[in-house]
């Protein structure tokens, strides 16, 4: 059975690629947060992650249109047939974002869905580059030209985007409406793109000071760590989650070991 959880560095260069039968996860730009000077000033930008459907080809996903019945399910199915961008970084990183997308063969007009994990400028500062994409920013889901649709996302009800692809409500850092993207079955296991639920590997001594709701964020962190094999944090390198195995008394008896 599962025991304590620990985290450790995930070695690899950016862009990090984790592929699966349905989607590939590519960390395009690694976020950072660097103290500046003697005061509390920080230079920061958020991590940007690309989720590519298997078999996607440029030009195949353009022309996203509202669903005929106005329902969010059909609209979401349409939105995930092309490249999905999770956060966009700040506007000061516009050039770096465009270059990173081009490296993956993706133009801004190819992107069919942008997920903003929360409403801070270093995470959604380039939304204007993607006017043809559907937007899921925090809990607001809208189609191009501003048609907003309901969807029912909450902590107890994830938003299913596709097979092995979900959006979770993970409140805390920016308030009650933060989200994370969960991609199952990749070559690295389950990858959770967590926004600032996790600032970076080893942030245990600092995340509370940046949180709007530390109690809710602690709950979100524990929930993510219970399923993730890899976490993509908001301001650092992706890291691995390792679950220690604790043997049950039945296992120990089978091995011939005494149980007190």
UniProtKB/Swiss-Prot annotation:
Main localisation: cytoplasm
Cofactor binding note from Swiss-Prot or TrEMBL: Binds 2 Zn(2+) ions per subunit.
Database matches in InterPro entries: MBLAC1, Metallo-B-lactamas, RibonucZ/Hydroxyglut_hydro
EC number of this enzyme: 3.1.27.-
Entry keywords, A to Z: Cytoplasm, Hydrolase, Metal-binding, Nucleus, Zinc
SUPFAM superfamilies, A to Z: Metallo-hydrolase/oxidoreductase
Binding site for Zn(2+) 2: 122-123, 196, 235
One GO term (biological process): mRNA 3'-end processing
Positions that bind Zn(2+) 1: 118, 120, 173, 196
Swiss-Prot/TrEMBL catalytic activity: a ribonucleotidyl-ribonucleotide-RNA + H2O = a 3'-end ribonucleotide-RNA + a 5'-end 5'-phospho-ribonucleoside-RNA + H(+)
Record localization: Cytoplasm, Cytosol; Nucleus
Pfam family, one: Lactamase_B
Key word Zinc present: yes
Cofactors: Zn(2+)
Molecular function GO terms recorded: metal ion binding; RNA endonuclease activity
One cellular component term from this protein's GO annotations in UniProt: nucleus
Presence of the UniProt keyword Electron transport in the record: no
Comment text on domains: Contains four of the five characteristic MBL-fold metal-binding motifs, with two waters completing metal coordination.
Function: Endoribonuclease that catalyzes the hydrolysis of histone-coding pre-mRNA 3'-end. Involved in histone pre-mRNA processing during the S-phase of the cell cycle, which is required for entering/progressing through S-phase. Cleaves histone pre-mRNA at a major and a minor cleavage site after the 5'-ACCCA-3' and the 5'-ACCCACA-3' sequence, respectively, and located downstream of the stem-loop. May require the presence of the HDE element located at the histone pre-RNA 3'-end to avoid non-specific cleavage.
Assembly and binders: Homodimer.
Similarity comment: family membership: Belongs to the metallo-beta-lactamase superfamily. Glyoxalase II family.
Protein's name in the database: Metallo-beta-lactamase domain-containing protein 1
Organism field: Mus musculus
């Amino acid at each position: 059975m599962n025991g304590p959880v620990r985290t450790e560095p995930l070695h690899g260069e950016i862009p990090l690629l984790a592929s699966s039968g349905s989607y590939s996860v590519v960390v395009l730009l690694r976020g950072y947060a660097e103290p500046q000077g003697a005061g509390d000033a920080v230079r920061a930008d958020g991590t940007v992650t690309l989720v590519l459907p298997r078999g996607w080809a440029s030009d195949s996903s353009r022309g996203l249109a509202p669903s005929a019945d106005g329902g969010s399910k059909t609209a979401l199915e349409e939105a995930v047939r092309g490249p999905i961008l999770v956060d966009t970084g700040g506007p000061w990183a516009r050039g770096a974002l465009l270059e990173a997308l081009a490296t993956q063969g993706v133009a801004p007009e190819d992107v069919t869905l942008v997920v903003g994990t929360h409403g801070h400028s270093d995470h959604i500062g380039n939304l204007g580059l993607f006017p043809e994409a559907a937007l899921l920013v925090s809990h607001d889901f809208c189609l191009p030209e501003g048609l907003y649709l309901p969807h029912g996302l909450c902590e107890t009800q994830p938003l299913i985007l596709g097979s092995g692809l979900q959006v979770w409500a993970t409140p805390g850092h920016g308030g009650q409406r933060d989200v994370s993207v969960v991609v199952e079955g990749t070559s690295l296991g389950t990858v959770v793109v967590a926004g600032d639920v996790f600032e970076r590997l080893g942030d245990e001594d600092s995340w509370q000071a940046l949180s709007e709701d530390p109690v809710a964020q602690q709950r979100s962190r524990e929930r993510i760590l219970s399923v993730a094999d890899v976490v993509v944090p908001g301001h650092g390198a992706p890291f691995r989650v390792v679950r220690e195995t604790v043997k049950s008394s039945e296992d120990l008896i089978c091995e011939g070991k005494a149980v007190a």
